[in-house]
Amino acid sequence: MKYRHSFHAGNFADVHKHIALLALLRALKKKGKGFLYLETHAGRGSYDLSGHPAEAAGGVGRFLEAQHEAPELREYAAVIAALRARTARRHLYPGSPLVAAAELRAQDRAVLIELQGAEAHALEQSLSTLADARAGGLPVRVERGDGFLRLKAFLPPPERRGLTFVDPPYEETQQDFRQVTAALVEATRRFPTGVLAAWYPIKDERTIGPWQSECLRALRAALASPPAVLASELWLYPRDSRVALNGSGLLIVNPPWLTLERMQVWLPELQASLTTSADAGSSTRMLSESDR
């Protein structure tokens, strides 16, 4: 499976991951001390949806048409509207780097890693547009390289607070799953108190449970005190279909206080805003000892 950010921009998986990302960032901002936001596979930062691609129409398009009760959903819609206004691009869809950059305070900073040169250049352009509208610019650094390999260079951060976001393209699905597992272990070993979120595609349900169990085993083997791990999943199609992307998953290591409880509120509401299909569903739970 290949999940390239530009091809799938604005689809249901993006909406899921970006709402969760925004909620995690705002949880970190509840304390005054600064933090590092580190992203391993940043992409180009923003996408033009003026052609109304089908995936975006069924994702962020449908989301923005709905009325929302959960604050997390309303806040995400407001972030999109604000970024479109600040950049004067009415069809802009902000990727995770722009969502994060717009949230940073003066005491926070971000390191965004991107392997592809053209994508990294486009990311710098996206950020410069945003920086022009902010006094003092953005505390953001773009690094060109392999995010899996470069991750360890930035952890632990001197701030001792941070969020690492791992979102590879899954061009080589099984290899990327293995690399995500290794990244989870490496990042948590270097920065045991840091928050880490890793996105994964749900295509063949039979592979997800064993992979989650392997992540837990690897964390337990590497760390004297294994961290709490939350799994959040949203699917719009039968989980065992092998035709296309069926669902979106996030593993969150060291989830901030109330992340589980709040996600159990807003994720079902998000699902209902995107589809009424009986095949759809959502789940948010802590991975437990029995899952190992």
Where are these regions (language model features)?
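Class I S-adenosyl-L-methionine-dependent methyltransferase catalytic core
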Residues: M1-R292
